[in-house]
Amino acid sequence: MLIHPRAEPEIAFLLAKDLAGPTSVTGVLAATEAVFGAVDILDSRYQDFRFRLPDVVADNASAGRFFLGPRTCRPGELEDLRLTGCVLRCDGDVIHTAAGAAVMGHPAALVAWLANRLAERGEHLPAGSLVFSGGLTAAVAIRPGHAVTAEFDGLGTVEVFA
């Protein structure tokens, strides 16, 4: 059961091989087997998502659920992930529009950032990891009965019913 869910569109990366830092967007793309359009459902037991770092860790980083789009492609099949457009709709109404560049300039930049932080601890992202880019738009509050749709250029549509 979700408490007060929010939805945000993201781009997900499925790693074909281990990814260790130091790395960059280029390294992430070379290690990626497939990319997906995705919708991340955030939820938190903390009222209005107000919490401190220890709280968010205890709350599993507000992770609720995630949904992957039906179409996958290799990174090179899309001209430039920075230009991958996204339209987020709720019950058919356009709520937000964005492009992949909304996340740190490139959606793979967050994956590189994560691999580099893990490398500082002597760790890495193993092959088979599914890593989300972070929200392309602000998260949108959803209620039971809402239909949330994220349409991605080249990656298809993800539809979620709350």
Regions found by a protein language model. Name each.
Residues 1-106, 147, 157-162:
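Catalytic-core "active-site belt" of small-molecule-metabolizing enzymes
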Residues 107-139:
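A conserved acidic, glycine/proline-rich C-terminal tail/linker
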